[in-house]
Amino acid sequence: MLHDLPTHLQAGVRVLHSLPPTAPDPIAALGTAPARVVYLSTTAVYGSATQVDSSTPVDEQSGRARPRLAVERSIAAGPWSSLILRPAAIYGPGRGVQESLPRGAYHAGDNYVSRIHVDDLATHAEAALLSDLEGVYPVADEEPCTTREIAEFCARLLNLPNVPQPAPGTQPRTTSNRRVDGSAIRRALGIALLYPSYRTGIPVSLKFGAQ
């Protein structure tokens, strides 16, 4: 996949970078052509922080954070304007608790997780590319919840009698306990969420995922 990326772009283009960290980072091959780069990073860079907003420091010691932070800093130091977005857990049609729960691939607990619907993330990304805003911002919807709460919600939508137990040998995808406030970037870009909560986003995701 990476070898298919363009290495020569017309001057002045605006680039959305959402690839996971690689060495060397593919953005380095673009030279000075881009006028702007928007990078989709992750809230994992905040490590064990339980309350996150645009002023929360990153965790430099986190093994998951270091590769992402290296890419963030490389982009921020480039000869272009840049904006770093750090999305919370991304869900949508074919992706999310509503998909993993019936397979027994979801661990319900009392840890908090913030989320963002893929359509809302796309709105953020488009607005970010078209703006001149710079800096670093977390991205999330308005309703963090525990992994148990969302599992129970999905179980009701799917007409499951109860939350299925995880399949033997499966491991929780995340053990983080993090509530993310994404209001600062929405204000800065002047955008509103289509799905302010998983309560509205997951039913729509199930509808479109079944098509």
Question: Which residue stretches match the model-derived regions?
Answer:
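Conserved beta-loop-beta element that borders a ligand/cofactor-binding pocket
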Residues: R73-P93
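C-terminal amphipathic/interface module of NAD(P)-dependent oxidoreductases
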Residues: R173-Q211
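Conserved Rossmann-fold NAD(P)-dependent oxidoreductase catalytic core, especially the SDR/UDP-sugar
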Residues: I27-G63
